[in-house]
Amino acid sequence: MQNKPARSMILPRMVVTGPGVLEQIPAIIAELDIPERGLIVCDAKTLKIAGNQVIEYLETGGHPMKKVEIIGASIEELEKVESLSHNIDFLVGLGGGRPIDLAKQAGFNKNIPFISIPTAASHDGFGSARASIRRDGRKTSMQAIPPIAVVAD
């Protein structure tokens, strides 16, 4: 029998699901021992649906927050997210695939942990270590990091 090389997978440290769990985000961040300053990545729709509420929960919990509204998951939007991630301790990707992929990739590029808050169950990449970013008009699957936590209300 031939020995095959071992494979490993990095998984989220915490997965929290259920009604009302968004209110628990400050406690989740404390349990994960993440420092205070955050950047939330969302689009205009998810900002209205849950983003403003998440920002309020986090700021009330002692986490100063910045936000960035994105239009798509392109290299240009990734650069926008990364330019706002200076002096940030964690990223939050809130929404469907595009905001989560941008937060995931920015976290990988800048070595910043990110929390995934999916708002659509139809997106399957909310816990993966790959990000789909549009480059030169084509989607490209890029190596990234999985979220430190997934929080799904």
Residue ranges and their predicted role:
Residues 1-90:
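ATP/NTP phosphate-donor binding region
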Residues 13, 108-153:
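A glycine/threonine-rich phosphate-anchoring loop and its flanking beta-alpha core
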Residues 18, 26, 95-97, 125:
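Glycine-centered flexibility sites
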Residues 23, 100-102, 130:
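Basic, gly/Ser/Thr/Pro-rich low-complexity segments located predominantly at protein N termini
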Residues 41-42, 95, 152:
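Short beta-strand/turn micro-motifs composed of small residues
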Residues 50-52, 102-104, 126-127:
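Short glycine-/acidic-enriched loop or helix-start segments at secondary-structure transitions
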Residues 72-74, 98, 121:
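Residue-level detector of flexible, active-site-proximal loop/helix-junction positions
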Residues 85-119:
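A short, small-residue-rich loop immediately preceding and capping a beta-strand
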